[in-house]
Amino acid sequence: MKGPGFHFDVHTDLRADQKAEVLIEALPWLEEFAGQRIVVKYGGNAMVDDHLKQCFAEDMVFLRQVGLHPIVVHGGGPQISHMLKALGIKSEFKGGLRVTTPEAMDVVRMVLTGKVSRELVGLINAHGPLAVGLSGEDGGLFSAMQRRPIINGKPTDIGLVGDVVSVDASAVEDLVAAGRIPVVSSVAPNEEDATEVLNVNADSAAAALAAAVGAHKLVILTDVDGLYADWPDKNSLIGRIGVETLRDMLPDLESGMRPKMEACVRAIDGGVPQAHIIDGRKPHSILNEIFTSAGIGTMVMPDEGLEMRSSYGY
């Protein structure tokens, strides 16, 4: 597809009438979400596979061009691990969490703000001057508190790792007002010592930012189809779930999924109407979630009578 300032390579076997049906299906969602803010947590395989990176950038450009305001928050676990290994710095994990020493924090900061952010900004800006990179340090965007998780029943020191405790979204608001796509790296100053920077969980940071900017949706990309009621039974994929039901499930979730679902709960508690977990391994999965009637993945909503339903049982 060609247009002023951008070029997407789209290959499809759909007939012309089928293509028209796809566009018509998107119409009510284009109307509903016009002018709305969508916070997207960029992660998983979508940020390491070159084709998926390109698809993600195209999705962000598409959202902006049709009148939505995407805001991207990213981590960079695989890239951080690769750089630490290349520099001969040991990576240690406790309870599934990376122990971040001052030496490792320098690498985290460098990789997130100087590599992952710059690459994504470049991919988006290949379609026009839309994206602007910033970190949680910029303009006091995030403030974090050092984290001491309970591991094996004891508070455990995992170094310069924190949780976002406050958000000043002024810098992001200014970029959105200017028609830009903010791309936010998940590092933040320590609220007890602003000269110290903490590595913060990108899922939680995205949820906090979504609440602060009044986003209509939080969308978290991951490497599974969504939340399963009875993993590994693939037929137990949950299409929609109320936040209170999800809150009760949190203690029993496996370690990889729990922080993502905790982020969904945090977003809903903060007033975001919808939070989604979708499979970022599938090209253009964000567009499928937002602009199709069935949607994909798992959607979390305020309860208000909403019962848990199996996938696609809308």
From Swiss-Prot:
One of its GO terms (biological process) is L-arginine biosynthetic process. One of its GO terms (molecular function) is ATP binding. The keyword Transcription does not apply. It comes from Bifidobacterium longum (strain DJO10A). Its EC number is 2.7.2.8. This is Acetylglutamate kinase. It is an enzyme of class 2 (transferase). Pathway: Amino-acid biosynthesis; L-arginine biosynthesis; N(2)-acetyl-L-ornithine from L-glutamate: step 2/4. Belongs to the acetylglutamate kinase family. ArgB subfamily. Catalyzes the ATP-dependent phosphorylation of N-acetyl-L-glutamate.
